[in-house]
Regions:
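Short secondary-structure boundary/capping elements
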Residues: 1, 24, 55-63, 84-88, ...
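Short, conserved beta-strand segments within well-ordered enzyme catalytic domains
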Residues: 20-22, 39-41, 75-79
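Glycine-rich, proline-tolerant flexible connector loops at the mouths of alpha/beta enzymes
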Residues: 28-67, 101-116
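Conserved, mostly hydrophobic/aromatic
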Residues: 25, 32, 123
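N-terminal amphipathic alpha-helix/helix-capping segment at the start of soluble metabolic enzymes
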Residues: 1-22, 136
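Short, hydrophobic beta-strand segments that form beta-sheet elements in well-ordered domains
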Residues: 19-23, 103-106
């Protein structure tokens, strides 16, 4: 299995179906890679470690590295979580990249994505079903299905 690049993703868009899976640990990442999953979404949640000890940046960094080591040939997108500023998103994305992530998922506003792009950091986000914004959209439902309504969601 050859690891995808951002360039590959752009070239395959609309032409090739890719598989994507959320993994929580190195065992899942390894199994997913062996199964041929193209893209893995990873995030750091202290409950996924189940260590019973306080977690900090060292644990997060080790978590990303463990998953990268377990799945060296899979495109990894690391979920940044909710951050308080575009600068903090850049800092977190640089740390994720330095620990093995190929891109980051950032669910914040477009100005965060723009800041990441301006720094050359590949970022993924979406408009549509955004669970943490369900109170704004009237529940868990897909929104922005056409260009006009998508632009309203974007605004």
């Amino acid at each position: 299995m050859t690891k995808l690049t951002v360039k590959d993703l752009f070239e395959k868009k609309g032409k090739v179906k890719l598989t994507e899976l959320y993994v929580t640990n190195a065992l899942e990442a390894h199994a997913a890679e062996r199964a041929g999953i193209d893209i893995q979404i990873v995030s750091f949640k202290k409950e996924t470690l189940r260590t019973g000890v306080p977690t900090n940046r060292w644990f997060r960094d080790a978590h990303i590295k463990d998953i990268r080591e377990a799945a060296p040939n899979t495109f990894m997108i690391y979920g940044l979580g909710q951050l308080s500023s575009p600068d903090k998103a850049i800092d977190a994305a640089l740390i994720a990249r330095d620990n093995g992530a190929d891109a980051v998922y950032c669910g914040n506003s477009p100005k965060y994505i723009e800041a990441l792009r301006n720094e050359g950091l590949p970022a993924v986000s979406h408009i549509g079903l955004v669970p943490y914004k369900s109170t704004w959209t009237g529940g868990f439902k897909a929104v922005g299905k056409d260009a006009e309504s998508a632009f309203k969601v974007y605004q």
